């Protein structure tokens, strides 16, 4: 990681608009690569109970790299006759005993699962609490989950980074971010030279009189397991008080390695309070106002949005704003699964641009967005992203923490949604989503965010989310304009090169039209691959600018005239349906370069015909049909087209 981070730093220095969120993404990718090997079978945790409370009481010996733990897990049964549950805990630990109602439970600890058997089965909604006594050397992925390390001046340091599946490397838990506990306590006893930092408020520091101290941190807000953290070193602190209103005040405290707490670092840290002001204005009051915010320096090159205290290896303005924004999007509202990681990382990356806009003006915002869009030769930018924004394979590190997709493209999608909705509805959407009672301090998926955007704007946004979240790539437009000699009206021609999924993009497009009398913005709704828009009121033209505000990620080619033959596809093709997987509807697109009789059918995996979508003669062109699987069961389906001598087959997945 040191070499990787140096490489990233060189790129960042050479390109000042290169978002610092990329530092975050590459570190997380390195972390995930190593922890996933041991944890993939545990995901998504035991769904037979709701976790409600965690209490970690840890005794950590730095010299021997040994941890003795007592962890309380409280929860509620989600089933009748529940006789057993399991917690996630790596096999490197020895479990001494598990206590339930003052008696020892029988247990087994195999394949990173701690299986517990209750003496009497639990009924639906029965509450329980178990205490696990365990010991051993915590797992280390090289950059988390639990690291014994040293500061630049060689003082001992300890830190954790549990995203995505690393919590069970150092404590027993339900390893699923969708099931947040209502509160948590972290109590750590270690050598007296350590200052121990964790989530929430510091309740007490006890000098034990034997060369150790005990720190007690209490978190009173819902929290996901991977956001519970430790950062321990000989910290020096810099703190300020944030006064948002007369009644909304909070301590902002930064824990730094003493040798790094320079005037330059302090100036970087002082950006935090104006950022708190900006994000509270945009998203609602800082979510954990009754506790704290701040940073704890640690030995990893990026940043990690641990709740109420981001762990930081660098302190540039971009990454400070990125990790702070995560307190709303990632911590307050957590993506319910890693398929939807863009709800965390895309939102935080876009918040970097919003901070620049508020602090330095719209030009800074535009420059940042242009940088995030990038080009296909810049691997970290949105145009280089491959595959859907919705992560198909959460076993792939490059899919989850991919800089181009989850970070850059996620941010660009929000920028484009802003263009579709307009500022008023867009910022209302962000605010209402952040404060929605169904999602705030809980977990959400993409459909939840879409529902808020549609409710606020009163617009059907299926087309937008289908193509930008579940589709891939971006539109490549050909554009021309002219005065039609037959009508004397302005006509604007827009065509798109064929894509795979979707075949073409449906988007509202802004046009700036100028002549001697007008200079105005018009919006057209482009929902065909080849489309001509007529403006009967405009008889002369100086120029037409396509998407002058750069609200769409695109490639644009200006052509000087219209050639109708170029609008006819040059080959037969059946495209991948989108979205895919789908529930219950999806779209299937195809092209035919000549007039043909077309037959398009859907079959189940056994070869039984379940639907006939097309059975008629079609003119040459581009077509889209919808398929509704509402009455079908989940599974793999086949769709096949025949057009003249051409035939092609593709697969699609219905998931209910």
Model-derived features with residue positions:
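Zinc-dependent metallopeptidase catalytic helix centered on the HExxH motif
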Residues: 310-371
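Hydrophobic helix-coil surface modules that form long, contiguous segments used
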Residues: 69, 160-163, 174-321, 350
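Acidic/His/Gly-enriched intrinsically disordered linker/tail segments
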Residues: 345, 349-412, 416, 420, ...
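N-terminal, polar/Ser/Thr-rich
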Residues: 20-68, 153, 461-463, 467
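Amphipathic alpha-helical substructures
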Residues: 403-492
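Glycine-centered coil/turn sites that cap beta-strands in beta-rich domains
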Residues: 563-578, 582-602, 612, 624-627, ...
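A surface-exposed beta-strand-loop module
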Residues: 21-23, 85, 90-151, 534-538, ...
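Short, surface-exposed loop/turn motifs with a glycine/proline- and acidic-biased composition
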Residues: 614-649
């Amino acid at each position: 990681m040191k070499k990787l981070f140096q490489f990233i730093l060189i790129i960042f220095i050479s390109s000042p608009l290169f978002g610092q969120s990329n530092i975050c993404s590459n570190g997380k990718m390195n972390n995930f690569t190593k922890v996933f090997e041991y944890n993939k079978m545990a995901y998504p945790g035991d769904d037979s109970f709701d976790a409600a409370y965690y209490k970690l009481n840890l005794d950590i010996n730095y010299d021997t790299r040994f941890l003795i733990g007592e962890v309380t897990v409280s929860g509620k049964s989600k089933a009748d006759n529940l006789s057993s549950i399991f917690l996630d805990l790596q096999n490197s630990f020895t479990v001494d005993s598990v206590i339930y109602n003052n008696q020892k439970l029988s247990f087994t600890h195999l394949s990173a699962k701690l299986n517990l058997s209750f003496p009497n089965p639990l009924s639906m909604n029965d509450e329980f609490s178990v205490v696990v006594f365990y010991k051993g050397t915590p797992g280390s992925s090289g950059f988390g989950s639990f690291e014994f390390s040293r500061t630049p001046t060689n003082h001992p340091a300890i830190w954790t980074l549990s995203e995505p599946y690393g919590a069970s490397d150092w404590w027993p838990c339900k390893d699923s971010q969708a099931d947040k506990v209502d509160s948590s306590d972290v109590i750590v006893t270690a050598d007296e030279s350590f200052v121990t930092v964790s989530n929430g408020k510091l309740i007490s520091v006890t000098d034990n009189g034997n060369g150790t101290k005990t720190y007690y941190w209490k978190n009173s807000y819902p929290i996901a397991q991977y956001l519970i953290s430790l950062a321990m070193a000989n910290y020096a602190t810099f703190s300020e008080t944030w006064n948002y209103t007369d009644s909304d005040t909070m301590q902002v405290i930064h824990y730094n390695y003493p040798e790094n707490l320079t005037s330059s670092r302090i100036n970087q840290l002082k950006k935090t309070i104006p950022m708190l002001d900006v994000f509270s204005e945009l998203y609602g009051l800082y979510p954990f106002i009754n506790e704290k915010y701040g940073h704890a320096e640690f030995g990893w090159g990026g940043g990690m949005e641990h709740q109420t205290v981001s762990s930081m290896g660098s302190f540039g303005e971009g990454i400070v704003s990125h990790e702070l924004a995560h307190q709303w999007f990632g911590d307050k509202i957590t993506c319910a699964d890693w398929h939807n990681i863009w709800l965390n990382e895309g939102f935080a990356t876009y918040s970097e641009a919003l901070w620049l806009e508020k602090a330095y003006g719209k030009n800074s915002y535009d420059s940042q967005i242009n940088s995030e869009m990038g080009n296909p030769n810049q691997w970290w930018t949105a145009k280089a992203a491959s595959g859907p924004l919705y992560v198909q394979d959460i076993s792939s590190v490059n899919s989850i923490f991919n800089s181009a997709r989850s970070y850059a493209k996620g941010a660009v999608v929000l920028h484009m949604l802003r263009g579709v909705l307009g500022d008023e509805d867009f910022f209302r959407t962000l605010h209402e989503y952040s404060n929605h009672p169904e999602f705030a301090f809980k977990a959400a998926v993409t459909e939840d965010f879409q529902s808020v955007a549609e409710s606020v704007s009163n617009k059907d946004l299926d087309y937008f989310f289908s193509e930008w979240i579940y589709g891939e790539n971006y539109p490549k437009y050909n554009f021309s304009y002219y005065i039609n000699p037959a009508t004397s009206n302005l006509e604007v021609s827009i065509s798109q090169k064929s894509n795979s999924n979707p075949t073409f993009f449906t988007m509202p497009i802004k046009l700036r039209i100028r002549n001697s009398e007008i200079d105005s913005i018009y919006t057209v709704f482009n929902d065909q691959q080849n489309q001509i828009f007529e403006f009967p009121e405009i008889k002369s033209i100086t120029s037409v600018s396509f998407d002058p505000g750069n609200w769409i990620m695109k490639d644009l080619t200006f052509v000087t005239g219209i050639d109708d033959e170029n609008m006819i596809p040059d080959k037969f093709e059946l495209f991948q349906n989108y979205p895919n997987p789908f529930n219950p509807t999806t779209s299937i697109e195809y092209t035919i370069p000549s007039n043909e009789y077309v037959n398009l059918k859907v079959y189940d995996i056994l070869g039984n015909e379940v639907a006939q979508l097309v059975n008629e003669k079609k003119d040459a062109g581009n077509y889209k049909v919808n398929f509704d699987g509402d009455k079908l069961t989940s599974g793999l389906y086949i769709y096949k087209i025949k057009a003249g001598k051409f035939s092609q087959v593709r697969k699609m997945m219905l998931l209910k």
